Design a protein with these regions (language model features):
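Conserved catalytic-core segment of NTP-binding enzymes
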Residues: 147, 167-182, 196-299
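Short acidic DE-rich linear segments
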Residues: 1-6, 300
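Short hydrophobic/aromatic residue motifs in ordered secondary structure
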Residues: 39-41, 141, 251, 279
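Short hydrophobic/aromatic patches at helix-to-coil boundaries
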Residues: 190, 299-300
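Short glycine-/small-residue-rich Rossmann-like dinucleotide-binding loops
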Residues: 110, 192-193, 222
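Short, cationic motifs built from Arg/Lys/His that form the positively charged side of catalytic pockets
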Residues: 141, 154, 191-194, 210, ...
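Charged, low-complexity surface patches
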Residues: 21, 114, 140-141, 168, ...
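Primarily NTPase-proximal linker/entry elements flanking Walker-type ATP/GTP-binding cores
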Residues: 4-137, 144-164, 173-179, 186-189
Length: 300
């Protein structure tokens, strides 16, 4: 977050005139891209600033930095505002009224902290008196089944699992049936995390989604991965569909560009951010706090 804050701060303090605006925006664009903001997002942000300043006599503004700050805040708020907002606990309670479990499917590549994030969500639900069961539908790696079982055992959540290399969709199906039989509120479906270019993986994901009929498909992305995280989100969104995001390692992200890019490119909300290794190190993503952190600007 600190690096984006410095980028915006430097832009606001520039001696801008109508003549120098174009070169200042080009410089801002390059700095944004250098701080993990995707090219399309950086282009859009700069274009929106240009549109907002059209017709303004920049040099005559009595408080230029305040004016630019307000423009930036409005533009970034717009970028971070999703097509629809999701109140997870409320959605779960509404679905449970029909005596059916709420089903969450987790997508993401290996190494992003997906399995730990599933455990964090299970722990979060437990704290809110919502029961859950996990489906070990990453049958591609035996270690994935063991890892999920380890985390869920730590927080007292049952895992439905089959043999290594068994059909992932059938594991998800069995977990849903178990939840219905035992009146469990939520089913958490883990999935394989191979590279997104793997067509077999995408077919597997599509089958899991067809069989389990999730109410929510969550993409788990590593906020330190920058454009890689964005490309993964786009691939999953195009092939399977994504409803919302969770960004891991958010506490270590000095740049802050991934959140901005993923929000702009997918138009889906960021529900939570991971801020540590503990099961309670998960926070709801707060747009206002994020904007405040990346626009840590001082008025002239």
């Amino acid at each position: 977050m600190k690096k984006l804050s410095k980028v915006f701060s430097a832009f606001v303090k520039k001696p801008l005139t109508s003549e120098t605006l174009e070169s200042a925006l080009n410089e801002l664009n390059l700095l944004l891209i250098g701080n993990d903001v995707a090219t399309e997002t950086a282009d859009a942000l700069c274009e929106k600033i240009k549109e907002s300043l059209k017709g303004e006599q920049i040099g005559r503004l009595t408080s230029k930095s305040k004016f630019l700050f307000e423009i930036l805040r409005d533009i970034i708020t717009e970028i971070l505002t999703p097509e629809r907002t999701i109140d997870l606990l409320e959605e779960i309670r509404i679905k449970n009224k029909s005596n059916n479990p709420y089903i969450i499917c987790f997508l993401g590549v290996n190494g992003t902290g997906k399995t730990t994030t599933i455990a964090k969500i299970a722990y979060y639900l437990k704290k809110n008196n919502i029961s859950s069961v996990a489906a070990a539908s990453d049958t591609f790696r035996a270690a994935a089944i063991e890892q999920l079982s380890y985390h869920m055992q730590n927080i007292g959540i049952r895992v439905i699992k089959h043999e290594y290399k068994s059909d992932p969709a059938s594991v998800a199906y069995d977990a849903v049936q178990h939840a219905k039989a035992k009146n469990i509120n939520v089913v958490l479906v883990d999935t394989a995390g191979r590279q997104v270019s793997n067509k077999n993986l995408m077919r597997e994901m599509q089958k899991i989604v067809r069989v389990s009929e999730p109410d929510l498909i969550l993409f788990v992305g590593d906020s330190l991965a920058g454009n890689d995280a964005l490309n993964q989100a786009k691939e999953f969104n195009n092939s399977v569909g994504i409803d919302a995001h969770i960004l891991t390692k958010f506490d270590a992200d000095a740049k802050g560009g991934a959140a901005l890019s993923i929000s702009y490119e997918t138009k889906k909300p960021i529900l939570f951010v991971g801020i540590g290794q503990g099961y309670d190190d998960l926070e709801p993503f707060d747009n206002a706090i994020f904007i405040s952190n990346i626009l840590d600007l001082k008025e002239e």
